[in-house]
Amino acid sequence: TDYFLEELGVEKFALLGTDYVYPRTTNNILESYLKDKGIEADDIFVNYTPFGQSDWATIVADVVALGEDGKQVGVISTINGDANIGFYKELAAAGISADDIPVVAFSVGEEELSGLDTSNLVGHLAAWNYFQSAESEANADFIAAWKAFAGEERVTNDPMEAHFIGFNMWVNAATEAGTTDVDAVRAAMYGQEYPNLTGGTAVMLPNHHLAKPVLIGEIQADGQFDIISQTSEVPGDAWTDFLPASAVLKSDWKELGCGMYNVETETCVQLTSNY
């Protein structure tokens, strides 16, 4: 979002998502964040579509219409699955390039692009904590090992790096604890560090989230990403400050033993998960 605002000069936002909890929660946070940054409510367009949505003509027309006053429009997409193919195809059919209306996707990565005709997607963006194109010796070794195991045509992606880091942290924590007992390993996990494949170091925080860099990649014709922006490690926050209901909440399992601690009432709202 900051990249859109600061680097691309986006003034109007289309928040497009598949109709389920992740896009709705993400867009609620984004709406609040954008308004906090001075974006007017009338300059934020939100739309949800079912899984597998194939008819994008009306929605793309609505997005294009946002820019009729000359303001720069950008799309933040939490569209999932095959619906992405139709969305980008409709953008191209309408003559809209990434230079005209940039799209940054939170759900499109190397695996989703593998084997697809990416001609309609070239130049658009995606945001992850990892891209296969990251240049580091550790990443080169990781990619080589994966291709040797799964086949030369297979790609790596962000969830794979997250699993790689998490598993290695667990091994180190279990080794330190001298046991695989859950409580002992969990106590040893806090503060664990492991190298990111993009460079830098991932750190396990007391809220069970990692500190990791945020990367923005530009889609290339071969389905890979050209990394155009990378932050330093950003601490993962279990509860966003941009929604009133969660702004008062804190997650700290190490000192407070609570994942949903209300800092105003100084009480643990919930000790156990709903799931």
What are these regions (language model features)?
Residues 1-94, 133-141:
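Extracellular/periplasmic Venus flytrap/periplasmic-binding protein
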Residues 18, 106-108, 129, 221:
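Cofactor-binding loop segments of dinucleotide-utilizing enzymes, especially the Rossmann-like FAD-
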Residues 21, 80-86, 131-193, 211:
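Extracellular/periplasmic ligand-binding modules, especially the Venus flytrap/periplasmic-binding
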Residues 47, 72, 110-115, 135, ...:
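Pocket-lining segment of extracytoplasmic ligand-binding domains
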Residues 96-119, 162, 186-195:
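Venus flytrap/periplasmic-binding-protein-like
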Residues 118-129:
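Rossmann-fold dehydrogenase core element
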Residues 191-275:
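Solvent-exposed, acidic/polar segments of extracytosolic/periplasmic ligand-binding ectodomains
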